[in-house]
A protein has these predicted regions:
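Contiguous C-terminal substrate-recognition/catalytic subdomains in enzyme active sites
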Residues: 109-216
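N-terminal Rossmann-like NAD(P) cofactor-binding subdomain of oxidoreductases
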Residues: 1-113, 136-137, 143, 186-190, ...
Length: 218
């Protein structure tokens, strides 16, 4: 039996004045809780002021597959606009947590469904990529269709993403937008921030999780 206790515990700590940084799903979609990808929406932290926790607050981070996708989408939205997204994920075993997927189920296998993952990939980006006001997020209008698969890779997810842009763009312009993209962590030179949030590879067989999962210190 899975009991969603994280949300209650987080609230209690916030009420006691603590800053709670949460990886659980419980408060991700709350109107006054930032769903943070610092390179994209650091301005959403102003929502903390709307929380009623007596000096404490809750900040969440998204689903792991959501993070990788929105980092690639943000430069496209800023430069060309975006109408629709279709994504198929190939997610590593590490994303299942502990005890995760049994060895007998995972070896020589692909599991073509991950409970709850598709909904997260279809809804979380709308909040992350939205605009903030004093007390909530105006979600971006974007149609996202997701299919999630668990594959026999130890660590490092891969996503196949198709997009429909609002405005025409050449391959060169898209690559330029990705390579020029940076966010607040890069501007502040934060110690754990990657030098570049996005890496583009010309090689047709790249990226590969085993080769690239630790690039730029992971």
């Amino acid at each position: 039996v899975v009991v969603p206790v994280a949300g209650e515990v987080e609230e209690e700590f916030a009420k006691q004045g603590y800053i709670v940084i949460s990886n659980s799903k419980n408060h991700r979609m709350d109107e006054d809780v930032p769903l943070l990808v610092p390179e994209i929406n650091s301005d959403h932290l102003q929502l903390i002021k709307a929380q009623k926790f007596n000096g404490g607050c809750i900040v969440t981070n998204p689903n792991c597959s959501t993070i990788g996708m929105v980092l690639a989408l943000k430069p496209l939205i800023d430069n060309f606009g975006l109408d629709a997204v279709n994504v198929v994920t190939l997610q590593a075993l590490s994303g299942a947590g502990y005890p995760g997927v049994s060895s007998l189920d995972s070896i020589d296998n692909v599991i073509p469904y991950i409970s709850g993952e598709e909904d997260k990939l279809e809804t979380e980006p709308l909040k992350i990529l939205g605009s903030v006001n004093s007390h909530s997020i105006n979600r971006i209008e974007l149609k996202i269709s997701a299919q999630c698969n668990r594959v026999a890779v130890v660590d490092g997810h891969l996503e196949c993403v198709q997009v429909k842009l609002k405005n025409k763009a050449t391959k060169e312009k898209i690559i330029e937008a990705w390579r020029n993209f940076s966010g607040e962590p890069q501007k502040l030179n934060l110690p754990t921030a990657p030098e570049k949030p996005i890496y583009y590879f010309d090689e047709v067989k790249y990226p590969q999780p085993r080769i690239h999962r630790n690039i730029d210190k992971g």
